[in-house]
Amino acid sequence: MQLETQDALYVALELVIAALAVAGNVLVCAAVGASSALQTPTNYFLVSLATADVAVGLFAIPFAITISLGFCTDFHGCLFLACFVLVLTQSSIFSLLAVAVDRYLAIRVPLRYKGLVTGTRARGIIAVLWVLAFGIGLTPFLGWNSKDSATSNCTELGDGIANKSCCPVTCLFENVVPMSYMVYFNFFGCVLPPLLIMLVIYIKIFMVACKQLQRMELMDHSRTTLQREIHAAKSLAMIVGIFALCWLPVHAINCITLFHPALAKDKPKWVMNVAILLSHANSVVNPIVYAYRNRDFRYSFHKIISRYVLCQAETKGGSGQAGAQSTLSLGL
């Protein structure tokens, strides 16, 4: 099948994004695994986020490319391809929400934080959040799908009954997942509320931090620790903001499709392609933010790339630098 120029460009850009997403987020996971300074509950949630982004590069983007070509397949196979990215998106949102709550506790109750948020509890929470993400993302399999309309043209069997269970459909996202699910359940129910909650949490974090910084009785050490927490919160708020900017265009188009179908029919194909590319590009951004905002991540990235990519031997001064870096173990 020969691709049009527009489709070929879309596929090429998706493949570039997939490669960068996998490489960058595998590097994040390796950095946390290799550096004791990065093995904090906050970063466990970031590893969960990175895992979702790796899966976007390995699976969701190839699935999206497949769906964009509109090949014929059975309904439930196409539905799985369409829903898998919803699972990963929901997992990312839950991971970001968990990080926001974690940072709020670190600033609101600093003396009790280490007892409340342990590595074991963080890993347990991550497991629960992934189960919830799969449940939410695969909800269309429970019946909230477009099977009746997608298979309405199936040929009837000899007894006059259409065999819809094995009827091939043109595998396009809107052919299998109804916009009512995407807008009312996915966006209004599962995406927008967590984003608004995170907005409130980060506003509260900065309000609490500013009040504490204004207290004259704060000792120099406590003040330095709090400033590091504020720096971490700013970095994480930046990640949430980038996530919202990357994903809201897709949801805006879905809302237009549902509420103004006549207007949606006239939209060029490239508009949706650009929105999808932007949402997938979000999986590339986070490692860049970590490297730019956090010395521990930056040092660990450099160490891993030097040793395993450039095949350079580690210098003797490396352990000393790692020791100096390990004093900052507050996430970002």
From Swiss-Prot:
The chain crosses the membrane at residues 9-33, 44-67, 79-101, 122-144, 179-203, 236-259, 268-291. Glycans are attached at residues 153, 163. PROSITE patterns: G_PROTEIN_RECEP_F1_1 (PS00237), G_PROTEIN_RECEP_F1_2 (PS50262). It comes from Mus musculus (Mouse). Disulfide bonds join 78-171. Belongs to the G-protein coupled receptor 1 family. CDD domains: 7tmA_Adenosine_R_A2B. Adenosine binds at residues 174, 254, 279-280. A lipid is attached at residue 311 (S-palmitoyl cysteine). This is Adenosine receptor A2b. Its main location: membrane.
